[in-house]
């Protein structure tokens, strides 16, 4: 993952609490269900923060009999067994950002240092699949890979993903942008 030229920072527990308190202040307390999604950047850079947020949101919403529903989108590079168990125990659906099999994944989604990501992602996904059967893959489709969409879906199904979703890349980069 890239940093888009910005300083990388992890949100503190105090900051997370402040954000949740602000959100809660304006929340419709008559709601029956509330959905919280952890995504963007790489949420698993702050596992401690996610665990805190899930617990704290549940505490706040329980005062009003509101059912919280959580989900997370991750590139799975930091998905360890402990956090996988947390996700399963808390019934948090997981979407994995992965662009295809080995070749396409390594080309499109290198690690921050430039090394290949597929083997790490594949291992972590397999570990999660041992305790949670149904995972969704989310593909970001770039110009060069449009003609390989069927192969991408087949590769991901063979990896064990139950669902495959795709989005077209949003960029002005002519090498990536889908123009046809």
PLM region spans:
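A C-terminal junction/extension of Radical SAM enzymes
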Residues: 175-180
